């Protein structure tokens, strides 16, 4: 029987499945950070349990860390406690930790792939909703809650029901300057922020195959923003070349053997999906969100929509509420909307390719008066690579702030946040009310679009930027 990639991955990891019961899956990799793990480790202690397979568990600090200093106290008391607990727990249970002073420290979904912890064919979990990022490698990766974190630590397994399947095909080839971020925002604009609910999404088509691994990670990172459980891209030579030689990747003959298996991780011809969505890449322009969920998105050269134009009464009410919160009036061109802050970073867009794209726009220009612009590399290795290429100098010369790795302004859990009423062009993944700080107004864009907003002081179409 023909199977989808998701079905192959799921079936390969079923440990036990009784009649009328939820299947038990084996988990190949468990990624841990400071926010969702303390209670899980406490649960192990309370029941006198050990971490079942510490060699398959990897921890880092990212959500709470300061991006201005490596001082554990810099982000406040709660952040300090959570980071100290992570140090204590990793020491006690034998889990490898990339702490603030480790060269590999960074955002968990950046760190995993670049160290070869993430590999095709794996099941990967983390107490973080954007774990879907790792699906870019043809791995089944999804976020879990704290009680599930404890269960995986204790057993290396997790009960999971089978999801529906969705195929999203992006046909043709994207125009120059159109990035994975634009593609995924256009997809969510079509499906809506709940269009993928109950599904695992496989992204395919010529436009997806043309993406680098960084681009595919951006794509899968935001699968959760359409309500999906996970996102997948079938592995290919681009995947294998990215993985080869990384710290935790197989070596020598083992790598060659692994590639032979990884090549089987494709959806079979004739396999059926529950839902199919199709887009034409040529029709995708640079995207900017205007509302308070990622599905409220338009092309940069469009005008802010009028709620009256929505036929669905729920969508109309949502649009009215979003515009009121965002302080926008229907009909105004997006390119006339001024911004206060720019954030280039997050697990969506903080990899070296993202920083190169932003630096290309920033080079020879200056951040507009009154705008604060932050560039936050996703990890220590990304920061080191960017500095080796001189990207930090380009940003600093243009007036951007060059920061230390961390989740930063993606979420208001550290010192990088918006003040009430401030408007931000952000390369992150969520634009909910208060996501970047109470009363903050978030517009999701690509790194190049964020840099363009920084140097012009408003949203600008990078295709015509002089």
From Swiss-Prot:
Q: Which UniProt keywords apply?
A: 4Fe-4S, Amino-acid biosynthesis, Branched-chain amino acid biosynthesis, Iron, Iron-sulfur, Leucine biosynthesis, Lyase, Metal-binding
GO biological process entries: L-leucine biosynthetic process
Extract the GO molecular function terms from the UniProt entry.
3-isopropylmalate dehydratase activity; 4 iron, 4 sulfur cluster binding; metal ion binding
What's the record's note on cofactor binding? Binds 1 [4Fe-4S] cluster per subunit.
Substrates-to-products reaction catalysed: (2R,3S)-3-isopropylmalate = (2S)-2-isopropylmalate
Return the broad EC class. Answer: lyase
The residues listed in the UniProt record as binding [4Fe-4S] cluster, with positions renumbered to this chain, are 347, 407, 410
Q: In which pathway does it act?
A: Amino-acid biosynthesis; L-leucine biosynthesis; L-leucine from 3-methyl-2-oxobutanoate: step 2/4
Q: Which Pfam families match?
A: Aconitase
Give its E.C. classification number.
4.2.1.33
InterPro entries documented for this protein: 3-IsopropMal_deHydase_lsu, Acnase/IPM_dHydase_lsu_aba_1/3, Acoase/IPM_deHydtase_lsu_aba, Aconitase_4Fe-4S_BS, Aconitase_4Fe-4S_dom, IPM_dehydratase_rel_enz, IPMI_cat
Identify which cofactors the protein needs according to its UniProt entry. Answer: [4Fe-4S] cluster
Q: Which family does it belong to?
A: Belongs to the aconitase/IPM isomerase family. LeuC type 1 subfamily.
> What is the documented function of this protein?
Catalyzes the isomerization between 2-isopropylmalate and 3-isopropylmalate, via the formation of 2-isopropylmaleate.
Subunit and partners: Heterodimer of LeuC and LeuD.
Question: In its UniProt entry, what is this protein called?
Answer: 3-isopropylmalate dehydratase large subunit
